[in-house]
Amino acid sequence: TDSKLYVAMNLSFACSLRMGEILGLTWENVHISDEDIAADNAYVYIDKELTRASKRAIETLGEKDIYYIFTPLMPNTSTRIILKKPKTDSSIRKVWLPKTLAYILREWKKSQDELKGFLGDEYQDFDLVVALPNGRPCEDRIILKEFAKLREDAGLPKVVFHSLRHSSTTYKLKLNHGDLKATQGDTGHAEIDMITSIYAHILDEDRKVNAQKFETAFYAKPDLRSVRPPEEPKEP
């Protein structure tokens, strides 16, 4: 699979990041030193997102919410790729990394630096973690196209990239036994309703399993198969 897609998929699933947050992540906000990893303190800090916006939307957002406007390859285009502040304050957050993902990011940084050295001045360094080979920002349509191809090649059901973030939320709620606040801290949801809804679905699935276990543990016993409910007493 394409390396940047591999990195993006891991960030989405392990860190519960949105697409714009993945594409807007910069290396200055990735903390993966030997000390960080050894102390289980490797993390990414999410404080911006990458998106494409119209000139009018850019004017509406204003300077305080936009960190950077990328120069377009085609000057006459009516939209611009921008790095901007997330929509809600709850989206600004620290998300801790599993060790494996920390090492994946280190290897990715190493290969990115090698490419940067090879291209020299042709590499446009914006400090982006998930970038095109020349360093320029990678738009969501590129990741979505690569993800769709990977899914089709693997013969998997039709799922979208965002499913990884949803699955991440579900998996974390199972692992932490329903710690809604800790999960919300990772996902950056402004309201806890979404997390609660996902957890309610998990509980329903677990309760189905309870019924199956009860069937195996109780009703499947040979001496219980012939048990019948007591007959109603006959009228004298």
Specify the residue positions occupied by each region the protein language model found.
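Catalytic-site neighborhood detector that most strongly recognizes the C-terminal catalytic loop/helix
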Residues: 38, 48-52, 187-213
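Active-site/catalytic core of tyrosine-dependent DNA strand-transfer enzymes
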Residues: 72-82, 88-156
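C-terminal catalytic core of tyrosine-transesterase DNA break-rejoin enzymes
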Residues: 10, 14, 21, 142, ...
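Generic structural detector for well-ordered beta-strands
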Residues: 31, 45, 94-96
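C-terminal secondary-structure termini that scaffold catalytic or DNA-interacting sites
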Residues: 33-36, 40-43, 48-89, 101, ...
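Residue-level signal for well-ordered alpha-helical positions
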Residues: 25, 108-111, 175
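Phosphate-coordinating loops and pocket residues in cytosolic domains that bind phosphorylated ligands
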Residues: 24, 32
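Basic, Lys/Arg- and aromatic-enriched nucleic-acid-binding interface segment
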Residues: 1-19, 23, 37-41, 90-92, ...
